[in-house]
């Protein structure tokens, strides 16, 4: 039997399983309970956050055969629920908008809509990547979408909602799917690892959650890759190696060198990372994120909820942050942000990263405002009320018996 990837094996089958989209689950569940289900829905959001999954769950909720009508909690065991989950229900069509872009495709779909469902309660059309439809295809859809048969429901999903015509948007209930927080992704990853009987340290879990960038599907794809490498045990350093992410200790050493002004150590760390085969563009992004974490740890009394870090890494960040000035961290962050823009167009990312780290490590110190005010007051006292140092200014006729004037810096 072929292997079923984690993203498919652990795909949510009910609204209760859906992670990070409670606003969608609650709204749809209440609409079903109150018998206020619209005829057309538009799900929008970045990849891997649950749009198509939610469309299938909604289809099961509307067509579940174990209840007398639509239910917010489908049974998952009746023929309709099983066939919808497998994508073989004859009354639930799931098509890819990228491969059905023309008017003829839409017309073929429309021809089947007036007929009653073969078995289910509703005939449901799920169109993924719906923004790929042509303008003429959308125009052909308009009338049907505005006044569909009572037994027909449309569910559209897209990652680029700005490409969907406003005339279509106005005919649909729109749901915006949020990016999933690293904390929620980490919770789900821990649960799946437990069910799969795989041991992983906290650094590995946090790294997977962080690299997923808000996408649960990406997180499970990354996890599959890491399990293939590490087997039944995952360690943070090994996960970092698989993903091409800089080792946490090396990244912390680089950040410390920049903060403490050791340009030579910063260059040595960059050289070690380059020799290790790490993507220095990725290293630069991780370094920028590290200084964000340092700033948060410096200004927030209890920063743990805002930092997706393992305990050991969190302790290192808090220790380094305690030795820095918030304004200094902001200055370094600004410099690194500009460096990322430069790396995007640079032919040699390593050189750009090296020079940026040297410049930031050799930054002039920030003087406290009290020291600046004290220096200004001292200068004013020396110059005196007449601005000439207590009568020592130039005499009429341009004479200056005191020799060369002293310049004030």
Segments (PLM) and residue ranges:
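Short, compositionally biased segments
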Residues: 51, 403-407
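P-loop/Walker A NTP-binding region and its immediately flanking N-terminal helices
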Residues: 1-174
């Amino acid at each position: 039997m072929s292997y079923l990837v984690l993203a498919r094996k652990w795909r949510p089958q009910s609204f209760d399983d859906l992670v990070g989209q409670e606003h969608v689950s609650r709204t749809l569940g209440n609409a079903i309970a109150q018998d206020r289900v619209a005829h057309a829905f538009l799900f929008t959001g970045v990849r891997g956050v649950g749009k198509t999954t939610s469309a299938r769950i909604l289809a099961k909720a509307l067509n579940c055969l174990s209840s007398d009508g639509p239910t917010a909690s489908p049974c998952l065991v009746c023929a309709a629920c099983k066939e919808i989950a497998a994508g073989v229900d004859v009354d639930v069509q799931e098509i890819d908008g990228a491969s059905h872009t023309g008017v003829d495709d839409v017309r073929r779909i429309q021809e089947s809509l007036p007929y009653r469902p073969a078995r289910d309660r509703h005939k449901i059309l799920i169109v993924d990547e719906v923004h790929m439809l042509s303008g003429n295809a959308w125009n052909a859809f308009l009338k049907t979408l505005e006044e569909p048969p009572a037994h027909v429901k449309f569910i559209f999903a897209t990652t680029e909602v700005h490409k969907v015509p406003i005339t279509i948007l106005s005919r649909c209930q729109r749901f915006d799917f949020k990016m999933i927080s690293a904390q929620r992704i980490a919770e789900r990853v821990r649960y799946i690892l437990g069910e799969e009987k795989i041991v992983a340290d906290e650094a590995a879990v946090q790294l997977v959650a962080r690299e997923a960038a808000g996408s649960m599907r990406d997180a499970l794809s990354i996890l599959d890759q890491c399990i293939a490498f590490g087997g039944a045990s995952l360690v943070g350093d090994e996960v970092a190696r698989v993903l091409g992410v800089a080792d946490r200790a090396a990244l912390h050493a680089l950040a410390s060198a920049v903060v403490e002004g050791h340009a030579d150590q910063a260059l040595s760390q960059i050289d070690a990372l380059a020799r290790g085969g790490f993507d220095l563009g990725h290293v630069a992004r991780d370094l920028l994120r590290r200084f964000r974490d340092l700033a948060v740890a410096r200004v927030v009394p209890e920063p743990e909820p805002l930092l997706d870090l393992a305990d050991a890494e969190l302790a290192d960040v808090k220790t380094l942050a305690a030795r820095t000035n918030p304004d200094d961290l902001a200055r370094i962050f600004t410099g690194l942000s500009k460096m990322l823009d430069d790396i995007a167009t640079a032919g040699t990312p390593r050189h750009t990263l090296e020079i940026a780290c040297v410049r930031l490590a050799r930054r002039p110190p920030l003087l406290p405002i009290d020291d600046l005010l004290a220096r200004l007051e001292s200068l004013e006292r020396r110059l005196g009320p007449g601005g000439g140092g207590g009568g020592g200014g130039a005499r009429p006729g341009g004479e200056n018996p005191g020799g060369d004037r002293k310049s004030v810096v």
